[in-house]
């Protein structure tokens, strides 16, 4: 689950991590008033669920309130397009107005999950303010990574080593140690999959400060934090993804024209790969899970068909826990209800597969069945030309 930068900074501030003074604005008039509070010279930052805002024109230094208001008018309602948004971009509905800070040095600091070790790892670099991926490619020696033992947690001596490796000393070194320990508390207590500060800066006055912040919460832990759903900005989410969430479906919109319904995340990823191998372009990632009911399958199929980009559907199901006849019933119910005329290819195997295929054949829908993943992928790609 994503949240906005201003929300991430509120959390960091509550844990004793210094952040710039700021106000959130919902109108250009509020931008002007906030700029006056900041003394006129301030930074205007569009709030969207994506990085790369600066290069897209979503971050600007202004020198007086009227200029801030004008820039607010320009930003509100505008779609920012960044490498993380896709070609459609994300609409700006909120703006963070922050005090301008004189910066002496910039660093990168984050704590994230390392899925290869199933542990949190702390990542730091003296190359802050840029995409960390660029630093990894161009200067991997400037990246410092520490895997954190879950039994002992992040220890002060480990944080001190990182701070020294960043070139900090004296009071700044000790301040950085305290900041990293507090950051680790945020990760644990808030059930985060990522907490990132980029850049973490040393100001001209000699203080550490988090100039930009990103926090992602672990979706599987949201039930432990009743306040999290209220923090979500649904205007930043795809409508189909919101609908999928209501039925506990894992759905991600992609840019192709082949709708996909699969059970199991691993099989879903493999399905996308094979479609690409045959020259197809998946329109979505959709995992219905291992124990989906007929109703859940029907809702999943409807969500796929709501996407105007979808020109054909590929269903790839392995019936272990799920029965193939239940899958077939859900597909038939949904396709009949919305009067689907799109070509559909279904590859099913496992429990009740013969019964499932028979139901599809007798349904009267534009459905073809396949006996393997490769055969099914090749067929739907061929049908769409």
UniProtKB/Swiss-Prot annotation:
InterPro entries: ATP-grasp, ATP-grasp_succ-CoA_synth-type, ATP_grasp_subdomain_1, Succ-CoA_synthase_bsu_CS, SUCC_ACL_C, Succ_CoA_ligase-like_bsu, Succinyl-CoA_synth-like. Signal peptide: none annotated. Binds 1 Mg(2+) ion per subunit. This is Succinate--CoA ligase [ADP-forming] subunit beta. The keyword Hydrolase does not apply. Succinyl-CoA synthetase functions in the citric acid cycle (TCA), coupling the hydrolysis of succinyl-CoA to the synthesis of either ATP or GTP and thus represents the only step of substrate-level phosphorylation in the TCA. The beta subunit provides nucleotide specificity of the enzyme and binds the substrate succinate, while the binding sites for coenzyme A and phosphate are found in the alpha subunit. Residues 9-243 form the ATP-grasp domain. Pathway: Carbohydrate metabolism; tricarboxylic acid cycle; succinate from succinyl-CoA (ligase route): step 1/1. The keyword Cell division does not apply. Substrate binds at residues 263, 320-322. GO terms for biological process: succinyl-CoA metabolic process; tricarboxylic acid cycle. It catalyses: succinate + ATP + CoA = succinyl-CoA + ADP + phosphate; GTP + succinate + CoA = succinyl-CoA + GDP + phosphate. GO terms for molecular function: ATP binding; magnesium ion binding; succinate-CoA ligase (ADP-forming) activity; succinate-CoA ligase (GDP-forming) activity. It comes from the Bacteria. Belongs to the succinate/malate CoA ligase beta subunit family. Its cofactor is Mg(2+). One of its GO terms (cellular component) is cytosol. Pfam families: ATP-grasp_2 (PF08442), Ligase_CoA (PF00549). Keywords: ATP-binding, Ligase, Magnesium, Metal-binding, Nucleotide-binding, Tricarboxylic acid cycle. ATP binds at residues 45, 52-54, 98, 101, 106. Mg(2+) binds at residues 198, 212. The gene is sucC. Its EC number is 6.2.1.5. Heterotetramer of two alpha and two beta subunits.
